[in-house]
Amino acid sequence: MKVAIIFLLSALALLSLAGNPPAEVNGKTPNCPKQIMGCPRIYDPVCGTNGITYPSECSLCFENRKFGTSIHIQRRGTC
């Protein structure tokens, strides 16, 4: 009887963990072209993983290239 209870509790725990997708810890990797000459002046803000709002994904890529950082997109929109 104890074995059956342990098995059922283990199965329930596994099912509850399997239903939740893992959280994205480091944010979404920005889609950066190989070379960035400049960014279009289109305002489509993104929130970087550093807590700074960038005017666009291109602007975030430009900053990453300029300073050698690897800031990701925490979410679309302002921080």
From Swiss-Prot:
Signal sequence, renumbered to the chain: 1-18
Record key words, sorted: Disulfide bond, Protease inhibitor, Secreted, Serine protease inhibitor, Signal
UniProt-annotated site: Reactive bond for trypsin, residues: 41-42
Positions marked as site (Necessary for sperm binding): 43-44
One BP annotation, GO: response to ethanol
CDD domains: KAZAL_PSTI
Subcellular location: Secreted
InterPro entries: Kazal_dom (IPR002350), Kazal_dom_sf (IPR036058)
Gene Ontology MF term list: peptidase inhibitor activity; serine-type endopeptidase inhibitor activity
Cellular component per GO, a single term: extracellular space
Protein name: Serine protease inhibitor Kazal-type 1
Domain Kazal-like: 26-79
Function: Serine protease inhibitor which exhibits anti-trypsin activity. In the pancreas, protects against trypsin-catalyzed premature activation of zymogens. In the male reproductive tract, binds to sperm heads where it modulates sperm capacitance by inhibiting calcium uptake and nitrogen oxide (NO) production.
Predominant location category: secreted
Disulfide bonds: 32-61, 39-58, 47-79
